[in-house]
Amino acid sequence: MELTRAKHIAFFKRHLILFPTPYEEHDCERTVLAFFCLLGLDLLNALNTIDDDDKKSWIEWIYKNYVTKESKGIKYSGFQAYRTGIQPISFEQEPQLAGTVFSICCLLFLGDNLSRIDRDLIKNFVELCKTSQGHFRSIAVPSCSDQDMRQLYMATTIASLLDFSLSDPLCSIQYIKSCQRYEGGFSLLPYGEAHAGATFCALASWSLILKMIPNSSLNTSNQSYNLMDCVPKVERLIRWLASRQLSSGGLNGRTNKDVDTCYAYWVLSSLKLLDALPFIDGGELEKYLLLHAQHALGGFSKTPGEFPDVLHSALGLYAMAYQDDKSFPKVNADIHMTSKYINICRDCIQAAKGK
């Protein structure tokens, strides 16, 4: 069974024009859905098949979700995942970490140079989302209860893309450590269940934080720039990640759970960050994805027999890219983009700094 590349390209392009009924409950997350469509096309080397007028129109739509606010004399800005309705953004509608990181990625995919965003105000927004325990809320409102490892990952990704450092990064590392479970994997919150998605967010955040802080801050017996040397119980962690692969070749995200296409991405990315990718049988995983997750109409499904969706389709392709650098562009492990667009982002930020 081969990758039906043309069908996958058509699948993502269809969804960029119109999302089917099953996506209705995710209407407030349109930017996130658009990101997975654009990521999928980038992995298939097909972003150039999007019409230039469409790209310009979508860029303008994304910037309509950019909002600047003020709290206690501090101005901050960021993106919403989707501004609902036709009225201007109200004061009650806050920018979100998810909306901000996925909007930045979409703008890069569409060829924007990020010149209309204010890095300093976005940095203020990220810092206002931070808690005293080192993790982050999804919005800059102290009463927000949406705060876990995912928000920490989005905050560190925003900081990395826009080239600024987080305050007190070592506190965030301590929070990550507090979420490691006895199996070696990480949970979304302290004392939770080890989960492959949370484990990726923990390791990727840790990796990005290590790149932000000076070497002098790491001169302790237990810390270094090598993630493998930093993570406690690393052998147990690798064993737990490797055990996510089942006899079908697919991967699950938690102990005693069924396979799910997206965990191919979360697990392989985690192992890649630990230089331990060979612990997964890539051939069996690819066979599973192509035979059981790939859909006849294009795209990949969450589990065999279900309809495909853009998230599982993009992440399934990303997992395959780790195993095949000839058919796919080079991918990045700690930020969910191809290396090409990570470099483009750095060039955009350096150009903005030079003005």
UniProtKB/Swiss-Prot annotation:
Source species, domain of life: Eukaryota
EC annotation from Swiss-Prot or TrEMBL: 2.5.1.59
UniProt KW keywords: Magnesium, Metal-binding, Prenyltransferase, Repeat, Transferase, Zinc
Pfam families listed in its UniProt record: Prenyltrans
Catalytic reaction annotation: geranylgeranyl diphosphate + L-cysteinyl-[protein] = S-geranylgeranyl-L-cysteinyl-[protein] + diphosphate
Biological processes annotated in GO: establishment of protein localization to plasma membrane; protein geranylgeranylation
Required cofactor(s): Zn(2+); Mg(2+)
Residues at which geranylgeranyl diphosphate binds: H195, A196, G197, R254, T255, N256, K257, Y263, A264, Y265, W266
SUPFAM superfamilies (alphabetical): Terpenoid cyclases/Protein prenyltransferases (SSF48239)
PFTB repeat intervals: 119-163, 169-210, 234-275, 282-324
Residues that coordinate or bind Zn(2+): D260, C262, H312
CC terms in the record's Gene Ontology section: CAAX-protein geranylgeranyltransferase complex; cytosol; nucleus
GO molecular function, one term: CAAX-protein geranylgeranyltransferase activity
Classification via InterPro entries: GGTase_I_beta, PGGT1B-like, Prenyltrans, Terpenoid_cyclase/PrenylTrfase
Family affiliation: Belongs to the protein prenyltransferase subunit beta family.
Assembly mode: Heterodimer of an alpha(cwp1) and a beta(cwg2) subunit.
Purpose: Catalyzes the transfer of a geranyl-geranyl moiety from geranyl-geranyl pyrophosphate to proteins having the C-terminal C-A-A-L where A is an aliphatic amino acid. In particular it modifies the GTP-binding component of the 1,3-beta-D-glucan synthase.
The protein, known as: Geranylgeranyl transferase type-1 subunit beta
